[in-house]
């Protein structure tokens, strides 16, 4: 009977509208604490559409500071304005998450071209210039506003900043909004690319009070009244504020805590604490997916070895398998130390005495989760190479 009540969403339910947490743009009519940024971007877009003033800007800030939210909100608002203002009818928009499409110059340009032209475009077999030409051909008497989310994935690839340069300097009405949480992203760009960039807009971390306000909006629209307390919202906000004011983390914790409280009618501290543990585990998986290729190979080797010397031998074999030049033992040892620093593996140094020297052992906790993350990550690496 309890399962039937759960299926029907009966007594003790906490979540009123889960879509609020999955697609918040359907709820938020404005974005709190980011109004000035929205206004600045809206003015740039208006000048672009009505006065032919192209622009480019970089949204820069730590994870969960509202960069993607602002970009997607602007995208949606422009789509609505197109219905009301004829001058916006000539604007085509392309929103591309560089990491999700693969991150290579070809993959990103293919996605942009497809969204602008509405035609299927191959990821391989076409040079970069041809993608740009196809976009330009489609923009005769038209304008394009291109959003490049997680643009650092593209920039750090060979030839990635050339893509930006070609877009920014193309003889066409193209404006670009880029999003990155790597505060050092500009260090990866060539001087000619930097000189083509417009202003950088910095997104400051939210403080605890701001996070609590944001959570109150999600709670109002997404949770059943009386299923949460002001203290619970403050608790989640305080935890998230300690970690660079991450609103995404705060919202995810609230939603997961609400799911854990389903059937009990009230979100309690124990639900939030369980949600925190799960969140940290999921973050570990995402961190593994974001590792450079040789770090992934080093981690695979570490899963199969008990010490660093053996791991390096396995790693070297993997490099041969993937047709990669292996890192030296010294550099490999540095990579292992970094993986230890990230908390993905644990390295112990055993002193075997004057005759035995020093041995570095490797321990890997939660191998099942790490193996799953590695399988997904290596599949993405494989797709990039075919």
Swiss-Prot record:
Carries keyword Transcription? Answer: no
Q: InterPro entries under this entry?
A: AAA+_ATPase, AAA_22, Cdc6_C, Cdc6_lid, ORC1/CDC6, Orc1/Cdc6_arc, P-loop_NTPase, WH-like_DNA-bd_sf
Q: Which GO terms describe its molecular function?
A: ATP binding; ATP hydrolysis activity
The job of this chain, per UniProt, is described as: Involved in regulation of DNA replication.
Gene Ontology process terms (BP):
DNA replication
> Is the keyword Nucleotide-binding in the record?
yes
Protein's recorded name: ORC1-type DNA replication protein 3
Instruction: Describe the family membership recorded for this protein in Swiss-Prot or TrEMBL.
Output: Belongs to the CDC6/cdc18 family.
Q: Which PANTHER family match?
A: CELL DIVISION CONTROL PROTEIN 6 HOMOLOG, CELL DIVISION CONTROL PROTEIN 6-RELATED
Residues engaged in binding ATP: 65-69, 206
What keywords sit in the KW lines? ATP-binding, DNA replication, Nucleotide-binding
């Amino acid at each position: 009977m309890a399962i039937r009540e759960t299926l029907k969403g009966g007594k003790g339910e906490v979540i009123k509208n889960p879509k609020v947490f999955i697609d918040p743009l359907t709820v938020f009519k404005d974005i709190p604490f980011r109004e000035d940024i929205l206004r600045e971007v809206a003015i740039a877009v208006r000048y672009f559409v009505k006065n032919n003033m192209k622009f480019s800007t970089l949204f820069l800030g730590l994870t969960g500071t509202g960069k993607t939210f602002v970009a997607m909100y602007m995208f949606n608002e422009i789509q609505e304005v197109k219905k009301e203002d004829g001058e916006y009818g000539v604007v085509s928009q392309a929103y591309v998450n560089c990491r999700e499409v693969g991150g290579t110059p070809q993959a990103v340009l293919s996605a942009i071209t497809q969204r602008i032209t509405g035609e299927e475009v191959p990821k391989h077999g076409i040079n970069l210039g041809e993608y740009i030409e196809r976009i330009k051909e489609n923009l005769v008497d038209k304008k394009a506003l291109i959003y490049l989310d997680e643009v650092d994935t593209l920039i750090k690839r060979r030839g990635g900043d050339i893509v930006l340069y070609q877009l920014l300097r193309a003889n066409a009405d193209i404006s670009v909004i880029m999003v990155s949480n790597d505060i050092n992203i500009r260090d990866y760009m060539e001087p000619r690319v930097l000189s083509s960039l417009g202003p950088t807009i910095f997104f400051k971390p939210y403080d605890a009070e701001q996070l609590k306000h944001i959570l109150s909006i999600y709670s109002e629209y997404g949770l059943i009244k009386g299923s949460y307390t002001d203290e619970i919202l403050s608790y989640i906000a305080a935890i998230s504020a300690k970690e660079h004011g991450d609103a995404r983390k705060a919202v995810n914790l609230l939603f997961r805590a609400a799911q854990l409280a389903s059937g009990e009618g009230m979100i309690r501290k124990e639900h939030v604490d369980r949600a925190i543990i799960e969140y940290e585990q999921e973050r570990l998986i995402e961190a593994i997916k974001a590792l450079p290729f040789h770090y992934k190979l080093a981690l695979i080797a570490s899963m199969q070895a008990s010490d660093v010397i053996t791991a390096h031998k396995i790693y070297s074999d993997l490099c041969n398998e993937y047709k990669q030049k292996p890192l030296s033992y010294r550099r490999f040892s540095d990579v292992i130390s970094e993986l230890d620093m990230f908390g993905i593996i644990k390295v112990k140094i055993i002193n075997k005495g004057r005759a035995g020297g020093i041995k570095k052992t490797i321990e890997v906790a939660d191998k099942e989760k790490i193996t799953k993350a590695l399988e997904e990550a290596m599949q993405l690496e494989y797709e990039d190479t075919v």
